[in-house]
Amino acid sequence: MVVIRLSRGGSKRRPFYNIVAANSANRRDGRFLERVGFYNPVASGGEEALRIAFDRVEHWVSHGAQLSPTAARLVKQAQAKVAPAA
């Protein structure tokens, strides 16, 4: 089963997460099918904290992918941020 979830990167005490579509049998930071965005929880200043390719998320969901609870929360948060601008 394909899952859209967070894969941790960054360094100690400075996390950075890639939002990836991966097989659920693979490890959290292991092999993935496609990177669909990123989340930087410690973004400061002009750094971008969250970017998601909604078209790719929709593609994977239409092909049966499940969103992890955290990924679903971030997608919802990003859509709320984009909607008022549009």
UniProtKB/Swiss-Prot annotation:
Keywords from the named record: Ribonucleoprotein, Ribosomal protein
Gene3D superfamilies for the chain: 3.30.1320.10
Biological process according to GO: translation
Domain of life: Bacteria
GO CC, alphabetical: cytoplasm; small ribosomal subunit
Keyword Transcription recorded: no
Recorded GO MF terms: structural constituent of ribosome
Family: Belongs to the bacterial ribosomal protein bS16 family.
Designated name of the protein: Small ribosomal subunit protein bS16
